[in-house]
């Protein structure tokens, strides 16, 4: 189990070449308009992503792939849930990069697929509890956004880590719930986050791809 956890941690590390640092998931737009101005705003925004936004939808996709569900319906759901062109490119391109690198590291090859589906598909072979896989994915997802927010708002590094730690209870609860949630119950409801992701496509001055 230790070896399996190390491998999953490697795959979800910021150093793994999926260019996660290039995506803000609409945060850059929300910060530029003043919707997110401090650590408290950031925490509330990320909580919404985690409980009703794309983050929790990704958690379902990771869980179902890790549990061995057919991958094609999961890939179709991932594309359908991407609310904008940039959101689709975010999950598609990171997934392709993840698959390309893990194909060189693993005995079996996967075809390109959306990022959460690819992570879940690879994690299935590790034999880890599905809830644990989901929890680590959610933490990595949110950690990447916090890193971007620290630079954009800006926040101090300590404030960023405080936000991250404040999310742990919700991550734990969500991971347990999402581990058994069927694909038929997947969905998103973080409307402001989706609108920010759409508006980012026409933002004139920007650093991040999404």
UniProtKB/Swiss-Prot annotation:
Domain of life: Bacteria
Family annotation (InterPro entries): UreF, UreF_sf
Compartments in which it is found: Cytoplasm
Functional description taken from the UniProt entry: Required for maturation of urease via the functional incorporation of the urease nickel metallocenter.
Species of provenance: Dinoroseobacter shibae (strain DSM 16493 / NCIMB 14021 / DFL 12)
Name used for this protein in its record: Urease accessory protein UreF
Presence of the UniProt keyword Cell inner membrane in the record: no
Keyword Aminoacyl-tRNA synthetase: no
MF GO annotations: nickel cation binding
Broad class of where this protein is predominantly found: cytoplasm
Keywords per UniProt: Chaperone, Cytoplasm, Nickel insertion
Entry-linked Gene3D superfamilies: Urease accessory protein UreF
Protein family (similarity comment): Belongs to the UreF family.
Subunit structure: UreD, UreF and UreG form a complex that acts as a GTP-hydrolysis-dependent molecular chaperone, activating the urease apoprotein by helping to assemble the nickel containing metallocenter of UreC. The UreE protein probably delivers the nickel.
GO cellular component, one term: cytoplasm
């Amino acid at each position: 189990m230790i070896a399996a956890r190390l491998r999953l941690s490697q795959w979800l590390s910021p150093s793994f070449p999926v260019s996660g640092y290039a995506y803000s998931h609409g945060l850059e737009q929300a910060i530029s308009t003043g919707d997110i101005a401090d650590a408290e705003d950031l925490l509330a925004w990320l909580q919404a992503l985690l409980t009703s936004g794309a983050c929790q939808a990704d958690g379902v996709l990771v869980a179902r792939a890790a549990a061995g569900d057919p991958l094609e319906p999961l890939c179709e759901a991932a594309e359908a849930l991407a609310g904008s062109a940039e959101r689709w490119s975010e999950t598609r391109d990171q997934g392709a990069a993840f698959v390309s690198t893990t194909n060189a590291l693993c005995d079996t090859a996967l075809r390109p697929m959306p990022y959460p589906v690819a992570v879940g598909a690879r994690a299935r072979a590790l034999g880890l509890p599905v809830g644990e896989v989901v929890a680590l994915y959610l933490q990595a997802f949110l950690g990447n956004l916090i890193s971007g927010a620290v630079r954009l708002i800006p926040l101090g590094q300590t404030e960023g880590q405080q936000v991250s730690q404040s999310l742990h209870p919700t991550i734990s609860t969500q991971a347990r719930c999402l581990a058994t949630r069927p694909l038929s119950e997947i969905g998103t409801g973080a409307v402001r986050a989706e609108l920010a992701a759409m508006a980012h496509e026409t933002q004139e001055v920007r650093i991040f791809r999404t």
